[in-house]
Amino acid sequence: MKTLYSLRRFYHVETLFNGTLALAGRDQETTGFAWWAGNARLINLSGKLLGAHVAHAGLIVFWAGAMNLFEVAHFVPEKPMYEQGLILLPHLATLGWGVGPGGEVIDTFPYFVSGVLHLISSAVLGFGGIYHALLGPETLEESFPFFGYVWKDRNKMTTILGIHLILLGIGAFLLVFKALYFGGVYDTWAPGGGDVRKITNLTLSPSIIFGYLLKSPFGGEGWIVSVDDLEDIIGGHVWLGSICILGGIWHILTKPFAWARRALVWSGEAYLSYSLGALAVFGFIACCFVWFNNTAYPSEFYGPTGPEASQAQAFTFLVRDQRLGANVGSAQGPTGLGKYLMRSPTGEVIFGGETMRFWDLRAPWLEPLRGPNGLDLSRLKKDIQPWQERRSAEYMTHAPLGSLNSVGGVATEINAVNYVSPRSWLATSHFVLGFFFFVGHLWHAGRARAAAAGFEKGIDRDFEPVLFMTPLN
């Protein structure tokens, strides 16, 4: 067995499989990890680990740029975005780029610019990643002490945490500045069916912003996912950005308190588990937001929410049958409840039929027809506008239900379009990835705690069959 020439480079977990495969000192015998353990080989090589992370960022940004350009190349302006399987252009449109009244795309050039900028950025990151992975110093502590670190150094770790928090705060303020000063963002609630507007009257009242956190997560309340005006969303980003930046400064200037030093595990794997746990929470919240919220994720770009498509179907048939002479205020359905309209448990007038369970829905095309006690019968008889009929018919046939083979929409709706809503994709992918990240959090937390407690033995490798087999190479 080769001698360990640097104790700093050895991290004790035995995973002997193929000890002959050496990669410039990043082999199993010098690190304790085989090649397939990936970045675990670099736990104590801050320079190489930097290269791995920068290269990873390059791959992420390359995907964003390439996928962005792919969507631009395939985009058909005459069709809604959600019918074209797009997941990136809706985000750009929501930020107010390239769209006009009603969410109509009037200019695709900003989308092209976005893709090109991401591609160029990915090239810079890719170069930096390759440089630090192959050519740069193995460890940063000696040459660049500011960027160097030891995982056990609690003070340095909280400083790094602080820097990350400040960067997140700056990111939150970028959205604020876009909404306030740089052209505004798309507001699905703008009169007449949505438009891009500057957000001038921010909600900064802490009772409103933090009131969302205290709401019940169940129907009618909906926790933070129930936010339905952009003033609250942008005001929330002012609060969040400020908290992140102030918290970042705090963590840079202070050392961890004694209780934190005792309570937390201070190792690279522990920090990995904390991060995975946080990302899992983000994934679950994003899943709920994209599935239920049609303000942060406007239906013009992402397609209707499930409740929205269901209510749209009830509204469409109310309009049709009312024109054919039905008295929608008193007609009885097959169950004896109102066929078109009924009362909610708390007395509001709501749509009848199966969609009664979605009576919580708020949507820009429906709210003008509500009065102080729910849906207003006189408005339903006299005030329905053509744009509301068109939009509800469109949403009725584009329910965000579907399978991987693209058989989309409500199974019983004969006019449903064969597509899968980006809402389905984004909600499902974030739920699944959030779950995987949560499992990763549990796994790495367990390993980190075991290592800290001193009973991390690994498997006894002395008599493992694979050790007596001929090496693959």
UniProtKB/Swiss-Prot annotation:
Write the protein's name.
Photosystem II CP43 reaction center protein
User: In what way does this protein cross or attach to the membrane?
Assistant: Multi-pass membrane protein
Record the organism: Solanum tuberosum
Report the coiled-coil segments. Answer: none
Gene it is expressed from: psbC
Q: Which Pfam families match?
A: PSII
From the Swiss-Prot or TrEMBL record, state where the protein is found: Plastid, Chloroplast thylakoid membrane
Grouped into one coarse class, the protein's main location is plastid
Q: What note does UniProt attach to the cofactor annotation?
A: Binds multiple chlorophylls and provides some of the ligands for the Ca-4Mn-5O cluster of the oxygen-evolving complex. It may also provide a ligand for a Cl- that is required for oxygen evolution. PSII binds additional chlorophylls, carotenoids and specific lipids.
